[in-house]
């Protein structure tokens, strides 16, 4: 099992934290364990409440069913069903940017 550094950033929410996240742990779960309060609703990858935007690194969000190919190509990620596959940086609180 690998552990990656995941940096979560939201200027509006005053968040700029780097957390450790195992490659078999969802990023949202790791953030909560680290004491961060990120938005979520379904926790199943079927809505956009937890949406973020990846700015560096890579993730696996193959469990998600909400984002379309264009949104994924643009870097959007559902943190509730995303595993890190490298060190990465994600802008949180990006739901409004999807629409």
UniProtKB/Swiss-Prot annotation:
Name recorded for this polypeptide: Ferredoxin
PANTHER family: FERREDOXIN (PTHR43112), FERREDOXIN-2, CHLOROPLASTIC (PTHR43112:SF3)
Domain of life: Bacteria
GO biological process, one term: electron transport chain
Gene Ontology MF, one: electron transfer activity
Record-linked Pfam families: Fer2
Organism: Limnospira maxima (Arthrospira maxima)
Function noted in UniProt: Ferredoxins are iron-sulfur proteins that transfer electrons in a wide variety of metabolic reactions.
2Fe-2S ferredoxin-type domain mapped to chain residues: 4-96
Presence of the UniProt keyword Magnesium in the record: no
Family assignment from sequence similarity: Belongs to the 2Fe2S plant-type ferredoxin family.
Residues annotated to bind [2Fe-2S] cluster: 42, 47, 50, 80
UniProt remark on cofactor binding: Binds 1 [2Fe-2S] cluster.
Cofactor(s) recorded in Swiss-Prot or TrEMBL: [2Fe-2S] cluster
Keyword Disulfide bond on entry: no
Keywords, sorted A to Z: 2Fe-2S, Electron transport, Iron, Iron-sulfur, Metal-binding, Transport
Annotated InterPro entries: 2Fe-2S_ferredoxin-like_sf, 2Fe-2S_ferredoxin-type, 2Fe2S_fd_BS, Beta-grasp_dom_sf, Fd_pln
């Amino acid at each position: 099992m690998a552990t990656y550094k995941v940096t979560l950033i939201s200027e509006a929410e005053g968040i700029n934290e780097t957390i450790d996240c195992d490659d078999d742990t969802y990023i949202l779960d790791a953030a909560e364990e680290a004491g961060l309060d990120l938005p979520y609703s379904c926790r199943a990858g079927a809505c956009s409440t937890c949406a973020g935007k990846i700015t560096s690194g890579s993730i696996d969000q193959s469990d998600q069913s909400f984002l379309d190919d264009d949104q994924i190509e643009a870097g959007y990620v559902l943190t509730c069903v995303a595993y890190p596959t490298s060190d990465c940086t994600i802008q949180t609180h990006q739901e409004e940017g999807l629409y």
